[in-house]
From Swiss-Prot:
PANTHER family: BIOGENESIS OF LYSOSOME-RELATED ORGANELLES COMPLEX 1 SUBUNIT KXD1 (PTHR37787:SF1). It comes from Saccharomyces cerevisiae (strain FostersB). It comes from the Eukaryota. Its main location: other. Component of the biogenesis of lysosome-related organelles complex-1 (BLOC-1) composed of at least BLI1, BLS1, CNL1, KXD1, SNN1 and VAB2. Residues 17-30 have a biased composition (Polar residues). Residues 1-62 are annotated as: Disordered. It is found in: Endosome. It holds the Pfam family KxDL. GO terms for biological process: endosome organization; regulation of protein localization. Residues 142-192 form a coiled coil. Belongs to the KXD1 family. InterPro entries: BLOC-1_subunit_KXD1, KxDL_dom. This is Biogenesis of lysosome-related organelles complex 1 subunit KXD1.
Length: 218
């Protein structure tokens, strides 16, 4: 009886030592924890195996069996973790395809470049260039002609301004001469009417008759 109790104590110490050397189960996300019932049943199986051997030589084989059993449990836990990881879809895969692929972006610069290229290729560029050159030449020649006309008109306008100023002075002089002549005629008429009234009236009648004859002939 004492021998059986000592063997059981030795087996418990060996299991605790082996169990402490194994990797911690808490690091596994989906590992199944070992309950007290599982531990007691595991101890009972170890004690039954040790009693059936009947000697202390079988302790090494029991320890190796326990280590192998723990390694198998760890491998099963790892397989279970891999299965759960594969079974649960990733969050990135749950996104719709429209969100991952927004579609092609409209390139404005590329569109403008293609449009210009098509317009140049479709038209005869050399003909357009020659037409532009001819148009530029015509515009330049007309511009020179207009400049010459403007210069001539400026010089002509200066001459006309000078003539106008001279004509204005001449007209003022003629006006003064006419006024002087009118005064002289009035003075002579008054003097002749007083000094020579008969001759003055005869001369006046002749002048009036001449005017009437001229009007009648017309």
């Amino acid at each position: 009886m004492v021998t059986g109790i000592s063997e059981e104590n030795d087996d418990e110490e060996t299991f605790s030592a082996v169990h402490s050397s194994t990797p911690s189960i808490n690091s596994q996300s989906y590992a199944i924890p070992i309950t007290e019932e599982m531990s007691s049943s595991f101890h009972d199986s170890i004690s039954t195996t040790s009693n059936s051997s009947g000697s202390f030589d079988s302790d090494g084989s029991n320890v190796s069996b326990v280590v192998e059993q723990n390694e198998m449990d760890n491998e099963s836990n790892v397989d279970e973790d891999l299965f759960l990881d594969n079974d649960i879809p990733q969050s990135s895969n749950l996104l719709p395809t429209d969100a991952q692929d927004p579609g092609p972006i409209f390139d404005v610069s590329r569109y403008i470049f293609d449009s210009l290229k098509q317009s140049i290729d479709s038209a005869d560029f050399s003909e357009a260039l020659s037409l532009q050159t001819k148009t530029s030449a015509v515009i330049n020649s007309k511009s020179l002609e207009l400049k010459q006309y403007i210069d001539e008109m400026k010089s002509r306008l200066t001459q006309l301004q000078e003539k106008f100023e001279n004509g204005e002075a001449t007209s003022k002089k003629i006006k003064r001469d006419l006024e002087t002549s009118r005064k002289n005629i009035d003075y002579l008429n008054a003097a002749l009417r007083v000094d020579f009234p008969i001759e003055f009236n005869q001369a006046r009648e002749k002048i009036l008759e001449r005017r009437l004859n001229e009007d009648h002939d017309c």
